[in-house]
Amino acid sequence: VVGEDRHHFAQVLLFLIDELKITIQGRKVKVFSLARIPDSDEENEIFKDCAVVYFLQSEENRWSECTLCDKKGVLAIGEGSKYAREGACVSIVKSRNRVKLLINREGYASRNLKVSSRLLRLRSAVDLYKKGG
């Protein structure tokens, strides 16, 4: 989780992962929280085993500086529609007091990731980002 975490998102996420005993391919999920995007020389060490990066709203003007976002196999998620417009895989946006996912298929493809067809069928909670639209 990268950015100014005023609502303690990282803590809540860690709590849910621990309570639900969530693993990925049998491996324990770790949650790290950074107040800002690290400098490029720090980035490789900090994110070396990272599979998902969640950017908070405070980083929407800087997130593309993070070279990790170009790494194959890393899912980039951001709070706010700007992230999907600028190449992230998923933006999380509020619409009519509901949370929606804005999916950028090109963002997935550029990182060698695939979007689940089950996720795409959730039309009430998912929109596809289209360039120019």
Q: Residue ranges of each PLM-predicted region?
A:
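Short hydrophobic alpha-helices and adjacent helix-cap/hinge residues
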Residues: 1-133
